[in-house]
């Protein structure tokens, strides 16, 4: 372990990388972060690496592709590349699963990871995205790789009504590819104390085709899909210190893609869409509902030196997958998750002197998560899982001489999961026969653990800010997957222990001159038990539970030599190793479904005349050749396929006609590069070997009032 930490530190010392202004994160010294400590604080007070994707960046990326998974792959180093489909399978953060939030409401379904949590909101309603990288327990279950928090737009201004209207079209140079999107945002104050914000968005996509004009695979395809998003926020200021706010955010997607599937050959011929489908699906693919309700109360002066924040929330999520003959008699599966939660957050000032100040943030989180995976015909694929999590926490923060920030915290996880009795599904084996269904007796599972974090940030001067931290996460990840493949007759015989991740991070950031910003970060994360998909001898997927180590580096450079131009980029690299027999031998690598290839993001943005902005983004994914194929068959197993490198350029531009009107346009895959996304290669399956989207254009018109 010491050798690993030293090697990562050495690599970080010689790695200088880049970060973009419109496509990547730019850290302003006064930038505010909400997610890191569950309160507003300057980014200069955070002892770890944070990526903030601003509203300006989101709007810029919208002119290229409105899929939030695509936006994030171009803006977040160490986040794996997008699949280009409705699933975010394989899109890990620093090699581990990420917890997705909308205004602090958990969207992820860690009890049975449906891989559709990142794509759970329309980007038009997002004000900013905060990405906390590395294991953390600050928001509870599921954040082994970090947190992605979508912070939605809020009421602003003193007008009774103001807003933003957008309409746009997308398409390729092929018949049937035309798509449309429209969004409307309204905000204002009805009275001096009562404010509101409301948003509606709709998008209809056309057919999606590769660089040769061939329809992409219909499996988990975003083509011919209706996407809906709505938001309503109502706020009332009781007085200068107290505020209550109620909000609803809803998202839904539904596909009517009637396209047949022509399965290709892995590494040779891509799987494509062709002809008409067999209409075996009884329910359209997509996410029929993602309802989020939240009621919050803020009191900035509950008593002397103490503030209080209370959040009560509900989430109702359902997503549906395509037809599969994996099951006996075939079928479509779904994931249903219903969450109820409360967060109680106190913030007490301990002291405040000229040279130091201290505060303690403390409270408790309560979460009930009911998750199940079934087939649309009613058969259970996982049992009903009912989790209750009660977690008190405390975080102490000390600021010395306005230069040194010290943080330390503890969180006690108390988790109980009720598992119902169930019969396992008969699924197809490699020889064409089906597994035998067995009855599994349910029961209660209970987990308890104390996890913590400690970190520092020393702001020497604008040129050098050092930070370092140790943090832990605690998660019950993929319990449903473990249960549904059970060969035991009772859950007590299964390996269902939680994952505790220890994350170590060391980095430096600063502004060398007024035109050059940088950041360098190295990290190591360890866990006694992981959860990785591996392929069994009959080619079915199973969860491997084994000790793991993931380590890597990332960094960025951002140049602004003149007011009319900026450029830069970022680089991220990681490696992961495991000990399958838990014997101290870490010569086995974690497969590519978790460990993504090194990634370079680069950009240039030019403003040649007033109101006009023109930019070019580049994503370069390096190749991966970490495993050898089977010596007899020449085939790779799942997650171990060789991944070739590829480079994609995107063009984007906008023109401010006046204070009210703006037009914008973008071209995705500018050079019409023919390539396959990483998942097509590392999955090593014929059905997953698909091409990526060819050149596609977007034109948008915006009106602000």
Model-derived regions, located:
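C-terminal beta-signal and adjacent terminal beta-strands/loops
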Residues: 474, 620-629, 654-705
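A beta-strand signature from Gram-negative outer-membrane beta-barrel systems
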Residues: 121-164, 704
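Flexible loop and strand-edge segments within Gram-negative outer membrane beta-barrel domains
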Residues: 205-209, 217, 221-227, 237, ...
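Gram-negative outer-membrane beta-barrel transporters
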Residues: 519-526, 544-630, 671
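Extracytoplasmic beta-strand/coil segments of soluble accessory domains associated
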Residues: 69-109
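Transmembrane beta-barrel wall of Gram-negative outer-membrane proteins
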Residues: 175-205, 214-258, 289-291, 352, ...
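Short acidic/polar hinge/loop motifs at secondary-structure boundaries
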Residues: 105-133, 182-184
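Membrane-embedded beta-barrel scaffold of Gram-negative outer-membrane proteins
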Residues: 307-325, 459, 465-477, 481, ...
């Amino acid at each position: 372990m010491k050798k690993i930490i030293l090697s990562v530190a050495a690599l970080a010392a010689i790695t200088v990388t880049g970060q973009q202004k419109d496509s990547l994160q730019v850290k302003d010294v006064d930038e505010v972060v909400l997610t890191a400590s569950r309160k507003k604080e300057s980014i200069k007070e955070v002892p770890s690496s944070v990526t903030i994707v601003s509203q300006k960046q989101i709007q810029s990326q919208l002119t290229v592709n409105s899929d939030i998974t695509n936006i994030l792959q171009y803006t977040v180093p160490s986040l794996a590349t997008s699949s280009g489909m409705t699933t975010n399978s394989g899109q890990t953060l620093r090699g581990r699963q990420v917890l997705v939030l909308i205004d602090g409401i958990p969207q992820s379904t860690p009890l049975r990871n449906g891989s559709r949590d990142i794509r759970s909101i329309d980007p038009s309603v997002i004000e900013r995205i905060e990405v906390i990288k590395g294991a953390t327990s600050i928001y509870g279950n599921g954040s082994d790789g970090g947190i992605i928090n979508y912070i939605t737009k809020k009421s602003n201004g003193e007008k009774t009504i103001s807003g933003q209207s957008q309409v746009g079209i997308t398409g390729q140079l092929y018949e049937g590819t035309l798509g449309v999107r429209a969004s409307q945002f309204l905000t204002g104050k009805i009275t001096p104390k009562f404010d509101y914000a409301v948003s509606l968005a709709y998008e209809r996509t056309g057919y999606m085709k590769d660089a040769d004009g061939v329809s992409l695979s219909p499996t988990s395809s975003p083509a011919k899909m209706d996407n809906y998003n709505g938001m309503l926020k109502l706020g009332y200021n009781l007085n200068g210190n107290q505020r209550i706010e109620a909000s609803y955010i809803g998202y839904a997607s539904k596909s009517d893609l009637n396209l047949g599937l022509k399965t290709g050959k892995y590494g040779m011929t891509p799987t494509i869409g062709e002809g008409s489908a067999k209409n075996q699906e009884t329910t359209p693919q997509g996410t029929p509902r993602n309802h989020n309700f939240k009621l919050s109360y803020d009191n900035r002066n509950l008593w002397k030196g103490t503030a209080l924040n209370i959040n009560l929330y509900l989430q109702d999520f359902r997503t549906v997958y395509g037809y599969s003959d994996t099951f006996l008699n075939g079928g479509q599966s779904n994931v249903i998750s219903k969450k109820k939660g409360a967060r109680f957050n106190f913030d007490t000032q301990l002291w405040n002197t000229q040279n130091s100040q201290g505060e303690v943030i403390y409270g408790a989180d309560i979460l009930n998560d009911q998750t199940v995976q079934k087939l649309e015909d009613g058969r259970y694929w996982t049992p009903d899982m009912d989790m209750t999590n009660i977690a008190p926490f405390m975080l102490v923060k000390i600021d010395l001489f306005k230069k040194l920030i010290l943080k330390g915290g503890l969180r006690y996880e108390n988790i109980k999961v009720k598992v119902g009795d169930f019969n396992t599904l008969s699924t197809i084996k490699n020889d064409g026969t089906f597994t035998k269904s067995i009855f599994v007796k349910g029961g209660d599972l209970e987990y308890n653990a104390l996890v913590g974090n400690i970190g520092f940030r020393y702001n020497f001067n604008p040129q050098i800010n050092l930070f370092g931290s140790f943090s832990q996460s605690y998660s019950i990840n993929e319990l449903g997957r473990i249960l549904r493949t059970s060969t035991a007759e009772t859950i007590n015989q299964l390996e269902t222990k939680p994952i505790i991740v220890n994350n170590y991070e060391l980095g430096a950031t600063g502004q060398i001159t007024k035109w050059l910003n940088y950041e360098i970060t190295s990290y190591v994360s360890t866990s006694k038990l992981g959860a990785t998909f591996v392929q069994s001898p009959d080619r079915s997927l199973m969860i491997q539970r084994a000790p793991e180590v993931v380590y890597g580096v990332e960094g960025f450079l951002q140049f602004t030599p003149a007011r009319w131009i900026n450029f830069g980029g970022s680089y991220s690299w990681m490696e992961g190793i495991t000990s399958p027999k838990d014997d101290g031998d870490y010569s086995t690598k974690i497969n590519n479904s978790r460990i993504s290839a090194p990634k370079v993001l680069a950009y240039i943005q030019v403003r040649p005349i007033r109101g006009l902005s023109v930019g070019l983004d580049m994503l370069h994914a390096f190749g991966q050749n970490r495993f050898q194929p089977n010596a007899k068959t020449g085939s790779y197993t799942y997650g171990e396929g060789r991944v070739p490198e590829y480079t994609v350029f995107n063009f984007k531009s906008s023109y401010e006609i006046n204070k009210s009107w703006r037009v914008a346009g973008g071209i995705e895959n500018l050079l019409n590069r023919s390539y396959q996304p990483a998942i097509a290669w590392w999955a090593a399956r014929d059905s997953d070997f698909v091409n990526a989207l060819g050149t596609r254009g977007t034109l948008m018109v915006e009106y602000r009032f």
